[in-house]
């Protein structure tokens, strides 16, 4: 296990504290439970600009994009971060099919690249420490999504 600095631990705790902000916590809960876009059109139809759901999407994605930017710059030890921040993996897994369209629409090939990069590194770390766990998580999430609500 790599040595971590006081500053890294302090930053990690500050990021965790931000996650506890009531509105962001509500947005994160909604995102994990409800955000399953099949296309950008589907997303915009279900969650139009100005809707509370659209606000939640932007809050969650912008929070994790900021965090990923910090992680990718090496300001937090990867292992320290990956041990307790699997949610970023779920966020990217939910948005990855529509990101290429957003990148094209905004003519920005780097749009959400920080989340994508952290996701890839987290998945590699997870597979090293728990082989097959990413596939198992994807299968579990697919089952949850396919279940009718209230079932």
Q: Regions from the language model: what does each represent?
A:
Residues 1-151:
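Acidic, Ser/Pro/Thr-rich low-complexity regulatory regions
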